């Protein structure tokens, strides 16, 4: 499968920007997990979890924190919709809502 970043009308790619804000180690760990999903799709827990419908999350354990990259699949593409550092037990509703909003705009 091919991996694409969600692109806003302005041309910005929020997940790419978010990844660039992280440390090199964090980017590498998240990138490895994205590549694992790309080449091994479909995958399940503990790396990938379905959030509902066609929305999924990649779950990456980083030093001292946990990252999530929310994505959907279209045809033979994985589209990275939103990325965030998880601070609570459940995924924040606002982050899931934002990913769903972006998915509807595809």
Located regions from the model:
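Basic, Lys/Arg-enriched alpha-helical interface segments
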Residues: 1-66, 74-78, 85-106
């Amino acid at each position: 499968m091919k991996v694409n970043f969600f692109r806003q009308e302005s041309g910005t790619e929020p997940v790419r920007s978010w990844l660039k804000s992280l440390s090199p180690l964090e980017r590498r760990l998240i990138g490895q997990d994205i590549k694992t999903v790309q080449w091994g799709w479909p995958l399940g827990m503990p790396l990938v979890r379905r959030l509902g419908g066609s929305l999924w999350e990649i779950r990456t354990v980083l030093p001292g924190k946990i990252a999530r990259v929310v994505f959907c699949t279209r045809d033979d593409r994985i589209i990275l919709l939103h990325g965030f550092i998880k601070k609570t037990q459940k995924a924040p509703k606002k982050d899931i809502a934002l990913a769903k909003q972006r998915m509807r705009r595809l």
